[in-house]
Amino acid sequence: MVNVLFQYTHLTKADPQLIVYIEYKKRGDFIMRIALINENSQAAKNEMIYASLKKVAESKGHTVDNYGMYSADDKAQLTYVQNGILAAILLNSGAADFVVTGCGTGEGAMLALNSFPGVLCGHVVDPSDAYMFMQINDGNAIALPFAKGFGWGAELNLTYIFEKLFEGEPGGGYPKERVVPEQRNKKILDGVR
């Protein structure tokens, strides 16, 4: 398979004007290093979340690093605020291009991550949230609710969310007739942050 290298401005660094080189496969998928970070209230679900994320991400050529918590019994009991700090360090250092995290509702994790420079985190509940967040907002992190509404079929919903999250090139705009205004709005947001 022929790989093409080109320049792509993306929010994976503290300076959004920094040009980051991302390898694109011929079929158009871009390659990311994805970090999974779980906090203490939902740590017991880490293995299931990781398996679902890894299955989808690797099928698209991405890699996934699991930063834990790995179980509810881990000695290090991470809060979503600590996860926000870790996410900011990973994203701003270039150790990760994207972060998947969450908490009981996903709200606290989203707020914590968005408290740090260089992080643009969306709250994602379903596959359409995932798709529109990546197409419209082109962020570098998502926070999921791992307790609220997380019952029967939760692993299926996770798989569908990850499939839509990593579908195609981010920042393409949605709906298609709104691509130009959406991309303009994103640049304004980047300038404010």
Task: Show where each model-derived region lies.
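C-terminal binding/interaction regions
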Residues: 42-44, 131-193
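A short beta-strand-loop structural module common to alpha/beta enzyme folds
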Residues: 61-75
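Short Gly/Thr/Asp-enriched flexible loops that form oxyanion-binding sites at enzyme active sites
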Residues: 108-121, 125-126
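A short, small-residue-rich loop immediately preceding and capping a beta-strand
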Residues: 96-102, 121
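N-terminal beta1-alpha1 ligand-phosphate binding loop
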Residues: 33-53
